[in-house]
A protein has these predicted regions:
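Conformationally flexible catalytic loops at phosphate/diphosphate-handling active centers
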Residues: 29-33, 144-188
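Glutamate identity and glutamate-enriched acidic tracts
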Residues: 15, 37, 41, 80, ...
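Thiamine diphosphate
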Residues: 1-109, 114, 131-132, 150-151
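Intrinsic-disorder/low-complexity, polar/charged segments
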Residues: 29, 40, 122-123, 188
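Conserved thiamine diphosphate
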Residues: 100-150, 162, 174-177
Length: 188
């Protein structure tokens, strides 16, 4: 599941995930990702929390003020040791005027939530570290905040060496995925 609320500069990530879902592109598990577009960033974080509690591997994409609205749910997710990754296109917060400059003030506001943090510096690193974050969260049950420069990296057009699903599968801790799903809340 990907719970989204498009916010610039993270919108392209959500748009790509939505496009893949619309075209029935399968993920590593042979499933189409379910996209839940919410009414706000806080709603997206709440949907991530609920989806994780139900046993679905879940992620979201956000930036700036949107990330700040997710902080209350980030505490819950970390406190309940739910494995997930928030992909953050980091940019300046609008303190008194709108700013689109890249900085890490949004990410640094989340240091105390219990999320581990992992940074990327290029488009290639963003793909590589996204995989590292997803594997690490499954192995540790510590949620991850994977961040990179907003606009510079999030909107850069660059050829990358994609990681094949076969290679990803070798890194995936299948037993940890099964343990996570077994802990899910189930009305039965």
């Amino acid at each position: 599941v990907a719970a989204i609320y498009p916010i610039t500069p993270s919108s392209p990530m959500a748009e790509v995930a939505d496009d893949w879902a619309a075209h029935d592109r399968k993920n590593l598990f042979g499933q189409t990702v379910r996209i839940a577009e919410m009414q706000s960033e806080a709603g997206a974080a709440g949907a991530v929390h609920g989806s994780l509690k139900a046993g679905a591997l879940t992620t979201t994409f956000t930036a700036s003020q949107g990330l700040l609205l997710m902080i209350p749910n980030m505490y819950k997710i970390a406190g309940e040791l739910l494995p997930c990754v928030f992909h953050v296109s980091a940019r300046a917060l609008a303190y008194h005027a709108l700013s689109i400059f890249g900085d890490h003030s949004d990410v640094m506001a989340c240091r105390q939530t219990g999320f581990a943090m992992l940074a990327s510096n290029s488009v290639q690193e963003a793909e590589d570290m996204a995989l590292v974050a997803h594997v690490a969260t499954l192995k540790s049950s510590v949620p991850f905040l994977h961040f990179f420069d907003g606009f510079r990296t999030s909107h850069e057009i660059q050829k990358i060496d994609e990681i094949a699903y076969e290679d990803m599968a070798k890194l995936l801790p299948a037993e940890k995925v099964a343990e996570f799903r077994a802990r899910a809340l189930n009305p039965d």
